[in-house]
């Protein structure tokens, strides 16, 4: 077990925007395009700037059918960020059994895109 001394407190708040999509009903037989939008606000209430990493997991394919096409992450123009994207396969191969149990499409049954963004200097009250 390792120890890491903490020199100062970090006060970071993440809130979801009211304009975010909360629910989307779809079937794979329908080929209509629907737009989903999620907004998150990150607020640094601390006394100093700090580096942060933000990671998004987005289900993009289920049984070789596209469920979310070309997910994008954008930041406020005043933030400098670098994002890396990679696809990850699901740990469960029997997606039908999992969907019957939970009725939730997530990265345990779908191929997901992992989008990791590093923000080297997240200023106070940004």
UniProtKB/Swiss-Prot annotation:
GO terms for biological process: cell adhesion; integrin-mediated signaling pathway; positive regulation of microglial cell mediated cytotoxicity. InterPro entries: Integrin_dom_sf, ITGAX-like_Ig_3. Gene3D superfamilies: ntegrin, alpha v. Chain A, domain 4. GO terms for cellular component: membrane raft; plasma membrane. It is a single-pass type I membrane protein. It is found in: Cell membrane; Membrane raft. Heterodimer of an alpha and a beta chain. ITGAM associates with ITGB2. Found in a complex with CD177 and ITGB2/CD18. Interacts with JAM3. Interacts with THBD. Interacts with TMEM268; this interaction inhibits ITGAM degradation via the endosome-lysosome pathway. Integrin ITGAM/ITGB2 is implicated in various adhesive interactions of monocytes, macrophages and granulocytes as well as in mediating the uptake of complement-coated particles. It is identical with CR-3, the receptor for the iC3b fragment of the third complement component. It probably recognizes the R-G-D peptide in C3b. Integrin ITGAM/ITGB2 is also a receptor for fibrinogen, factor X and ICAM1. It recognizes P1 and P2 peptides of fibrinogen gamma chain. Regulates neutrophil migration. The integrin I-domain (insert) is a VWFA domain. Integrins with I-domains do not undergo protease cleavage. This is Integrin alpha-M. The gene is ITGAM.
């Amino acid at each position: 077990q390792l120890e890491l001394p903490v020199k100062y407190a970090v006060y970071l708040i993440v809130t979801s925007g009211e304009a975010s999509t909360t629910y989307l009903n779809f079937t794979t037989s329908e080929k209509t395009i629907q737009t989903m939008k999620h907004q998150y606000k990150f607020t640094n209430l601390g006394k100093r700037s700090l580096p942060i990493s933000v990671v998004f997991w987005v289900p993009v394919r289920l049984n070789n059918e596209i469920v979310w096409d070309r997910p994008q992450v954008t930041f406020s123009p005043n933030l400098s960020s670098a994002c890396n994207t990679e696809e990850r396969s699901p740990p469960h191969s029997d997606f039908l059994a999992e969907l019957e149990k939970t009725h939730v499409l997530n990265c345990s049954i779908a191929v997901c895109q992992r989008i990791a963004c590093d923000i080297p200097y997240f200023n106070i009250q940004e």
